[in-house]
């Protein structure tokens, strides 16, 4: 009788348990399901514009106008590089040894490497308009002129080593933005080696 009573009591306790083993995994709330969105070209270009601005590309690649508060990027020639027709002042020989100097518009620099000129990075064919995205990535990550393997290195002050580990998505966004810019025709002068100054 005692065994029957214990068995009945255990049966009653088991019947009172309302927890049911799930037959399906619990539903994940919609807010936690990662959504894969196809990025639009406009979104890539906007991201690229943002990156170009925060990376300071206009500092060197845009000719300047002089205003009451100093130089500012010329809105008609944004990212078009050193103006082809702009003559440089005489280069101080001391700069070739221990200095790096910028011309007033910040589009030309002189130092032990000679004189370098900021490139035209607009969508014009005299800029990067005929470059592939792969060429652009090679220039940014490997420092090759026009992104062509075996070409001359990009010269100071271009900080390409800072971009060597930039994610593909950011390189692609910058390229998409630059290819959407107003094309500005401007063939930037070739660099001048120190022995020709």
Where are these predicted regions, by residue range?
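Bacterial signal peptide processing site
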Residues: 17-19
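Electron-transfer interface patches adjacent to heme c in soluble/periplasmic c-type cytochromes
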Residues: 77-137, 161-171
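Positively charged n-region of N-terminal signal peptides that target proteins for export
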Residues: 1-4
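Electrostatic cytochrome c docking/interface patches
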Residues: 28-53, 66-68
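C-terminal capping alpha-helices of c-type cytochrome domains
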Residues: 130-146, 160-189
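The canonical Cys-X-X-Cys-His
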Residues: 48, 54-64, 136, 174, ...
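C-terminal motif of bacterial Sec signal peptides marking the signal peptidase cleavage site
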Residues: 12-15
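Surface-exposed aromatic
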Residues: 152-161
């Amino acid at each position: 009788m005692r065994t029957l009573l214990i068995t009945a009591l255990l049966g009653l306790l088991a019947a009172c348990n309302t927890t049911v083993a799930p037959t399906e995994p619990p539903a994940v709330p919609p807010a936690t399901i990662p959504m894969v969105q196809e990025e639009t070209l406009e979104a890539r270009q906007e991201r690229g514009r943002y990156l170009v601005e925060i990376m300071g590309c206009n500092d060197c690649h845009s000719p300047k106008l002089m205003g009451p508060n100093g130089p500012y990027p010329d809105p008609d020639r944004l990212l078009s590089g050193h103006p082809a027709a702009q003559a440089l002042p005489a280069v101080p020989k001391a700069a070739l040894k221990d200095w790096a100097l910028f011309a007033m518009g910040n589009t030309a620099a002189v130092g032990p490497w000679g004189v370098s000129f900021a490139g035209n990075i607009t969508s014009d064919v005299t800029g990067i308009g005929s470059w592939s995205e792969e060429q652009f990535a090679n220039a940014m990550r490997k420092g090759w002129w026009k992104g062509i393997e075996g070409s001359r290195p990009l010269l100071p002050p271009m900080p390409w080593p800072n971009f060597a580990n930039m994610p593909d998505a950011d390189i692609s966004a910058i390229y998409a933005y630059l290819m959407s810019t107003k094309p500005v025709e401007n063939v930037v002068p070739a660099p001048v080696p120190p022995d020709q100054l």
